[in-house]
Amino acid sequence: MSRERASFGSKIGMILATAGGAVGLGNVWRFPYMVGQNGGAAFIIVYVACVLLLGIPCMVSEFIIGRHGAANTYRAYSEVGNGRPWKFVGFLGVMTGVLITGYYAVVSGWCLQYVYASALGQLRGETSFVKSYFQSFSTDPVRPVFWLVAILLLAHYVIIHGIRGGIEKASKVLMPALFILLLVIVVASCMLPDAGKGIDFLFKPDFSKFDRGVFLGALGQSFYSLSIAMGCICTYASYYSRQTNLLGSAVQISFIDTMVAILAGLMIFPAAFSVGINPGSGASLVFLTLPNVFNQAFAGMPLLGWVVSLMFYLLLSLAALTSLISLHEVGTAFFYEELHISRRKGAAIVTASTMAVGVLCSLSLGAWSSLQIAGRSLFDVFDFVTGQIFLPVGGFLTCVFLGWFVPKKLVKDEFTNWGTLSSRLFPVFLFLVRFVCPVAILCIFMHQLDVI
């Protein structure tokens, strides 16, 4: 079945869609904490350096493969590699994207539940109450499944309407809405008493905390935050025009992703320190600590506290949804192009399969908690396999593939838009992809496995 390749209709739509794929829950619940615990501004400086030396070159590599291949991730690697075994790196990206969609939908569903709970004022109470609420909800066999199905159906609705009518159109609404919500909460948080302590925690440089662990943490964050090796960057790039400046786009997307993460810190820490709470990281920060932070910080203004809490979880849901849409598209493009079926049928396959994975992961935290593999719940197994094995392996092989096996002329033509853009930075890019990025990703991989 021959079909004309879809494409983004505008540069702003392309940037917002790809940035939406990069911006996710990790920007809110991991990056700010890492900044505060690892030297503040000192960590940010190291992180930005890692983005420049690792994140952006890896992203441009996927852009080149995706745009040149002009197909789903699996076929793009095959096209660029002339059908050689490297196409299985593309298939690894597809499989990783689909698996992440399944368990990521579980946490995304929790965000929707908290929007609902915030709207009804159900999160007002001490930390012990909120912890009990989360424990009861997350282990329930029905409610988490309902919400994960709901958010997957939202992503499905966007996907079936195509690139311009679905993904691009939705991104032009969701991403500005995310920024507006973020800025409003930042302003409200920074106006609280003792907010300056939280700002100092986030930005005051403390080079005494800098060590190997801080460097490796910044390195890993720069890799994961930009959604490298998940298939979505390569898939979205297949819809880019020949006029798109790949390096410039990667810089813009990385800037947006980093700004969201820093603003998230300005949203969380001033409020937390105003009530004397040193927030942790991960899901416990979002679902256990912050409801109580909002309750205490705005105790004298209950209506404002209700609004801020509602807006925060709506913000989280938008960030989760934009990521889910990009991950969903990875599998959808693969199925409808490889099986020669309609986009709607391809999307239906992905939605059904990821719902199945999501339901299994959700139940493994409650009713089926006894079902474990190597002492891990199914949720943790999917998280470990995709995050600590598939992603670094896929990123490493992508750099080796583009740096050493793809013809240099092809890479340079894509990098410079066939000579219409400056080639001054091309030798630097190629050096980073060939030597720096593979070593950096190996360090991330070994650090996660506690080898270094």
Each model region followed by its residue ranges:
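Membrane-interface "cap" regions at the ends of multi-pass membrane proteins
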Residues: 1-29, 56-63, 67-80, 84-91, ...
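Hydrophobic alpha-helical segments of multi-pass membrane transport proteins
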Residues: 320-326, 347-365, 380-414
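Transmembrane helix-boundary motif of multi-pass solute transporters/channels
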Residues: 10-48, 237, 248-251, 255-258, ...
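Inter-helical loop and helix-membrane interface segments of multi-pass membrane transporters/permeases
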Residues: 2-7, 33-38, 68, 73-92, ...
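Hydrophobic, membrane-embedded alpha-helices of multi-pass small-molecule transporters
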Residues: 9, 16-26, 97-101, 105, ...
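A generic transmembrane alpha-helix motif of multi-pass inner-membrane proteins
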Residues: 377-401, 422-452
